Amino acid sequence: MGAQLSTLGHVVLSPVWFLYSLIMKLFQRSTPAITLENPDIKYPLRLIDKEVISHDTRRFRFALPSPEHILGLPVGQHIYLSARIDGNLVIRPYTPVSSDDDKGFVDLVIKVYFKDTHPKFPAGGKMSQYLESMKIGDTIEFRGPNGLLVYQGKGKFAIRPDKKSDPVIKTVKSVGMIAGGTGITPMLQVIRAIMKDPDDHTVCHLLFANQTEKDILLRPELEELRNEHSARFKLWYTVDKAPEAWDYSQGFVNEEMIRDHLPPPEEEPLVLMCGPPPMIQYACLPNLDRVGHPKERCFAF
């Protein structure tokens, strides 16, 4: 009798086990492999393409471990690049312009600070010049994810006050963004995540500051997003030196620009900032305060 029950159990369970195994295999196939499995480990990635965007801006493409790998970077987070340059370890944070929708590669758009071009920084940028000198096939170490903010979708942001604290959830209907120069990359990451989801009705207002019109990083990508999602993405520029027939603002970020081109405080938006520290400290925060945006709803990358 026991043998008969055992046989019967085998007959009954075999199809169930087969179905379970099939589902697990399908699930495993549908879950891509993650490159950044451990934020404390450095992963060497190989340069496979370098595109000249402008006289001082490059798009660097690095291969992930396999064509099926994703980077594994939550929206709002960044990575660190590390390299030994002139005998010293140099580490710099960057936000990719690619996303986890892209398999097999990660893209970084980086402004190269060449030596002897800025009187205050005659040596130029150590990491950006190192990247510029890299040849196809060379590797550099990536580490991450890092950062205090994660965008979880549909207006929900998880923000940690510091690395040791639990995240505080802020849910908003609109997001104000102030970016300066290369500080556009984390903004673009969040904007793309919002715009690609038709069920995410969060409205983004971006005020983007640069020295000149030619310095506007990722302008084609930004304007394409604005044209495709005009109801949800508002874009405004300001430059220090404006050309003739310039349709946007001129000068440093000020109270009037914030009042006119960011969502009003009454909407209780989250305001994100990324740019040179003096811009954040002397232009963004004081003027946001004057307009009425409370500090607890302002976040600097």
Swiss-Prot record:
Localization (cell): Endoplasmic reticulum membrane; Mitochondrion outer membrane
Name the EC number(s): 1.6.2.2
A molecular function (GO) held by this record is: FAD binding
Where this protein primarily resides, as one coarse class? endoplasmic reticulum
Write down the superkingdom of origin: Eukaryota
The residue ranges crossing the membrane are none
Listed cofactors: FAD
Recorded hits in CDD domains, A to Z, give:
cyt_b5_reduct_like
Keyword line: Acetylation, Cholesterol biosynthesis, Cholesterol metabolism, Endoplasmic reticulum, FAD, Flavoprotein, Lipid biosynthesis, Lipid metabolism, Lipoprotein, Membrane, Mitochondrion, Mitochondrion outer membrane, Myristate, NAD, Oxidoreductase, Phosphoprotein, Steroid biosynthesis, Steroid metabolism, Sterol biosynthesis, Sterol metabolism
The GO biological-process annotations, alphabetized, read as: cholesterol biosynthetic process
Q: Which InterPro entries match?
A: CBR-like (IPR001834), Cbr1-like_FAD-bd_dom (IPR008333), FAD-bd_FR_type (IPR017927), Flavoprot_Pyr_Nucl_cyt_Rdtase (IPR001709), FNR_nucleotide-bd (IPR039261), OxRdtase_FAD/NAD-bd (IPR001433), Riboflavin_synthase-like_b-brl (IPR017938)
Residues involved in FAD binding? 92-94, 109, 111, 114, 126-128, 185
Q: What happens when you mutate residue 164 to E?
A: Decrease of activity
Domain FAD-binding FR-type: from-to ranges: 40-152
- Residues carrying lipid (N-myristoyl glycine): 2
- Residues recorded as bearing Phosphotyrosine in the entry: 43
- N6-acetyllysine modification, residue list: 42, 50, 120
Q: Which Pfam families match?
A: FAD_binding_6, NAD_binding_1
Q: Name one GO cellular component term.
A: mitochondrial outer membrane
Entry similarity comment: Belongs to the flavoprotein pyridine nucleotide cytochrome reductase family.
Query: What functional role does this protein have?
Result: Catalyzes the reduction of two molecules of cytochrome b5 using NADH as the electron donor.
Its recorded name reads NADH-cytochrome b5 reductase 3
Organism expressing this protein natively: Bos taurus (Bovine)
In the record, what lineage is assigned to the organism producing the protein?
Eukaryota, Metazoa, Chordata, Craniata, Vertebrata
State the encoding gene: CYB5R3
